[in-house]
Curated annotation (Swiss-Prot):
Pfam families xrefs: TRAM, tRNA_U5-meth_tr
Active site per the UniProt annotation: 407 (nucleophile)
UniProt keyword Iron-sulfur present: yes
Catalyzed chemical reaction(s): uridine(1939) in 23S rRNA + S-adenosyl-L-methionine = 5-methyluridine(1939) in 23S rRNA + S-adenosyl-L-homocysteine + H(+)
Chain sites annotated for binding [4Fe-4S] cluster: 91, 97, 100, 179
Protein name (Swiss-Prot/TrEMBL): 23S rRNA (uracil(1939)-C(5))-methyltransferase RlmD
EC class: transferase
Family: Belongs to the class I-like SAM-binding methyltransferase superfamily. RNA M5U methyltransferase family. RlmD subfamily.
EC numbers, comma separated: 2.1.1.190
Secretion signal span: none
UniProt entry keywords in alphabetical sequence: 4Fe-4S, Iron, Iron-sulfur, Metal-binding, Methyltransferase, rRNA processing, S-adenosyl-L-methionine, Transferase
Residues binding S-adenosyl-L-methionine, per UniProt: 283, 312, 317, 333, 360, 381
């Protein structure tokens, strides 16, 4: 029997395992195209590289973040040959902070990339092309984000408090003092927040911080133990200087430091005020949110004698504007506390033709009395998992028109397959640029019963 070659291991199946590339290794690569998430794709020695911060046609030096099998994730460290499309990022932390991934791409090209991603998913998964493509719905490139979560961590070994945002593909914190995508009201708070927190006598009890801007500005601090009196006074003075409410989140639910303080946002075209609390979902881009609602109402076009169902209604972001047009709105949400707040929002805005119900929308609708009432139109705004169980039964509602707002083109495409089976046709679709400078795609699609 022949001796084994030194260093060679025989595998039961599949031949010799490929050599894994260590994290931190640098490699020169030729970028061939962009992936669905905006990263450059390169091929080398049988492996596919996904390179953040690169563009098609570029020659770059990339640093490996992690490697698994034949897939390598990396980030651009140096550009040898740049694409004509490349632009200087607006943020000094770009490439280190995990918040924005495509600041090096012109905004018009960002929109085109997102539109292509949506079109490819619909065609590949559902074999569908909409009758009409809508123009991308977009707003300002920067200073759009009205809500942010700031990471805070005490490094006991280094005796250092880190304040900032999570690094790309990591739990590390990138220390940040400015963020150009935050709305203007939050930028001075963000710039002075790290120094204020680092002055605390007991920084080890600090958790994350959340910043909000709406009808009022607010700072929420998560803490794992009671704050020292001096530290609380420092925090209160900081918030007073910036005209912000202070919310504290220790044990139990977050509470305002000043009883009676509330959070909310306005939907000006409909003269609506929506109240919410920390932990509730709201859209972070106020301008695109308003434009999205306007487009949804225009596409769905509910008549004054029609009944509309709003599924995954949240705080009433769509349901309350819909109530100004339709005869009757039935709005359904899975989170009981948000159903309660949505109902309060309807009453406080003097809307009496909208009813709210709590239901598990990951399950079919067949057993709900409100689902059997009959509707002319349905609006869906599900989470990333989509609404597969709902759309399987949607034709039983009698809806002739269905408007689907999606935060995940993959599940929209999957659900489109089922809607086509149910007898609907995709009439119109387009992207919603809710998160400029990122590859995150939101979309709107209008379905109508096939004639």
């Amino acid at each position: 029997m022949a001796k084994h070659e030194r260093g060679l291991r025989f595998q039961p199946t599949g031949g010799v395992k490929s050599v894994q590339i260590p994290a931190g290794k640098k490699q020169r690569l030729s970028i061939e195209r962009l992936s669905d998430d905006g990263r450059g794709i390169a091929f080398l020695e049988g492996k596919t590289w996904f390179v953040a911060g690169s563009l098609a046609g570029e020659e770059v030096e990339a640093r490996v973040l992690n490697a698994r099998g034949k897939v390598v994730e990396a980030r651009t460290e140096r550009v040898f040959v740049a694409s004509d499309l490349r632009r200087a990022p607006a943020c000094d932390y770009f490439g280190r902070c995990g918040g924005c991934s495509v600041q090096h791409v012109p905004h018009e090209e960002q929109l085109a990339l997102k539109q292509r991603m949506l079109a490819e998913q619909l065609l590949r998964v559902a074999n569908v092309v909409p009758d009409e493509w809508a123009a991308p719905l977009s707003g300002a490139e920067l200073a759009y984000r009205r809500r942010a979560r700031v990471a805070v961590r005490w490094d006991a070994k280094a005796k250092r408090l880190d304040v900032g945002f999570r690094a790309a593909a990591s739990q590390d914190i990138v220390s940040i003092e400015e963020c150009p995508v935050l709305v203007q009201a939050l930028q001075p708070i963000m710039s002075q927040l790290p120094a204020m927190l680092k002055s605390f006598s007991k920084p080890q009890v600090l958790g994350h911080v959340e910043l909000f801007s709406g009808s009022s500005t607010a700072v929420l601090l998560r803490h794992t133990a009671p704050l020292a009196e001096a530290d609380l006074a420092t925090l209160q003075a900081f918030c007073k200087t910036h005209g912000a409410q202070l919310w504290l989140h220790g044990e139990g639910e977050p509470q305002p430091a000043s009883p009676g303080d509330t959070l909310g946002y306005r939907l000006e075209p409909w003269n609506l005020q929506l109240a919410w609390r920390p932990g509730d979902f709201i859209q972070v881009n106020a301008a695109v949110n308003t434009a999205m609602i306007e487009q949804a109402l225009h596409w769905l076009a509910p008549a004054a004698d029609e009944r509309v169902m709003d599924l995954f209604c949240g705080l009433g972001n769509f349901a309350l504007p819909l109530a100004s047009l339709a005869k009757d709105v039935v709005a359904v949400e899975g989170v009981a506390t948000m159903v309660e707040r949505a109902a309060v929002n309807a009453m406080s805005n003097d809307l009496h033709n909208v009813r709210f119900f709590q239901a598990d929308l990951s399950q079919p609708l067949t057993h709900a009395d409100w689902a059997a009432e009959g509707f002319s139109a349905v609006l869906l705004d599900p989470p990333r998992d989509g609404a597969f169980e709902v759309v399987r039964q949607i034709r039983k509602t009698g809806a002739q028109r269905l408007l689907y707002v999606s935060c995940n083109p993959a599940t929209l495409a999957r659900d489109t397959v089922e809607l086509v089976k149910q007898g609907y046709r995709l009439k119109r679709a387009g992207i919603l640029d809710m998160f400029p400078q990122t590859a995150h795609v939101e979309a709107m699609a209008l379905f109508e019963v096939s004639k």
